[in-house]
A protein has these predicted regions:
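Outer-membrane beta-barrel porins/channels
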Residues: 130-144, 160
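Cleavable N-terminal export/targeting peptides
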Residues: 1-22
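Outer-membrane beta-barrel translocator domains and adjoining extracellular loop/strand segments
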Residues: 36-39, 71-75, 102-107, 138-146
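Outer-membrane beta-barrel "beta-signal"
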Residues: 146-160
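Short glycine/proline- and aromatic-enriched beta-strand/turn motifs that initiate or cap beta-hairpins
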Residues: 16-65, 160
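Feature marks short, surface-exposed loop/turn motifs that line or immediately flank catalytic pockets
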Residues: 31, 65, 99, 134-136
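First exposed extracellular module after export/assembly in secreted or surface-exposed proteins
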Residues: 26-28, 123, 127-129, 147-149
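Gram-negative (and chloroplast) outer-membrane scaffold detector with strong preference
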Residues: 48-128
């Protein structure tokens, strides 16, 4: 059993090392909940891992500055489509797991889509995106309970 686990970890590690990755921050300044409450400014640590073809996974760990002390972990799957030159757009499903003000966990399903710039001669990525979600299982006072969305600007370092 230990050998099988070791082989599995090695294979997963090599697959992550073989593909390009992006790491950086995602900063949101716009957002609302179903009751129109402003959700405040949010920041997320962001990691993208490219899969085969023009597809990738995105992992985000976020924090909210509003009074709910909301912590969020999001996973998204993106399909990428070229626009022109170094520009492309992406869209895909997303799942969020959140924790609100020591009152409980929440689960959200939604989507994420946006546009990005990956200059060929610089190891950065700049992007803007929107993430509409429907969040449930949270206490009623949490800002994200029900339908909500967020718009964000991202800056990431590209690792090839």
């Amino acid at each position: 059993m230990k050998k099988l686990l070791l082989v599995l970890v090695a294979v997963l590690g090599l697959s992550f090392a073989a593909n390009a990755q992006n790491i950086g921050g995602r900063f949101g300044g716009v957002g609302t909940s179903k009751n129109g409450a402003n959700v405040g400014y949010n920041a997320e640590l962001s990691y993208q891992h490219y899969l085969s073809g023009p597809n990738r996974l995105e992992f985000d760990l976020g924090f909210s500055r509003n009074n709910d002390n909301y912590v969020n972990f999001a996973i998204g799957y993106h399909w990428l489509f070229p626009i022109a030159g170094d520009f492309s757009w992406f869209i895909g499903p997303a799942v969020n797991l959140g924790y609100c003000n020591n009152d409980g966990f929440g689960l959200a399903v939604g989507a994420q889509g946006g546009a990005e710039w990956n200059p060929k001669n610089a190891p950065i990525q700049l992007a803007v995106d929107a993430r509409p979600v429907y969040e449930f299982l949270l206490p009623d006072h949490c800002a994200y309970n029900g339908f909500g969305y967020g718009v964000a600007f991202s800056v990431r370092y590209r690792i090839h």
